[in-house]
Amino acid sequence: MVKVGILGAAGYTGGELIRLLINHPEAEIVFANSESNTGNLVAEVHEGLYGETDLKFTAEMPFDQVDVIFFCFGHGKSEAFLKEHNVPENVKIIDLAQDFRLAPETVVATQQPTPAAHDFVYGLPEINESKIAVAQHVANPGCFATCIQLGLLPAAKMGLINSDVSVNAITGSTGAGQKPGATTHFSWRNNNMSIYKAFNHQHVPEIRQSLKQTQGYLDAAIDFIPYRGDFARGIFATEVVKADKPIEEIVAGYKEFYKDAKFTHYVDKAIDLKQVVNTNKCLVHVDKYGDKLLITSCIDNLLKGAVGQAVQNMNIMFGLDQTAGLRLKPSAF
């Protein structure tokens, strides 16, 4: 049984992680840390867990009693936490923030505010499963980055990312976190839509890093426009790139790339969000219009885009079945 500690357990990702782990056949939550909710029942904060657990939030962090710690902090807090606390070397870490996602060479090239030296493995199982399996520390990918990469990686494997890539993706309100803000209130978000961080989203360096790893080079720009949607969960992305291969060859390449993937699947028909919301799946579909390859990909931003993928990484790190605790039904209808 894998003994688990959770830091930052009161937010959306913390609550979703608890939901998964209390039903995980090979994991046990030892502590769920939240200074602001110390002593409160988890179900009083994450009300969807009424009747599911008697776990209480604690301010304590008994590192010596756990095998792995999940960091569910806001961005920038994980690095500071590790500088201030002595986490035993034998305890594995899975960080859901962006602090350690970029390799040192990527940090230098992009001048990102990320530590220049670290041993965190980028936790995208579709390309890094063998590295994750022996890793002590894993940096969980971003939600947009996961969805977009999984759409583009097979194309990169075929050497098709040679021209600028146009990406549009829309995300649910939970992607902004639990803390209320001007663009997360129901009265603003409902029946509304807007763009933000156009061409400057923090996940683009992650995407470029993985495409370069897969293709061997990357000279093309990733022109990414993110959208805020008026729904709670999910990301739906379109990626457009020029491609000179016939569609039959491209489809075959996508199916080959994901033939052994546990959660990412190529689908012959058009895809939609309800097929993936509440699951750890990513679905991918391609069409071709002249020399334009249109790729669509979709995920649940809190699951495959966050804690579902984190649990998948935990399973890999401890030699468990990747699907343990993650056999989830989509909202679908």
What are these regions (language model features)?
Residues 18, 149-156, 204-208, 255, ...:
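Predominant activation on well-ordered alpha-helical scaffold segments within soluble catalytic domains
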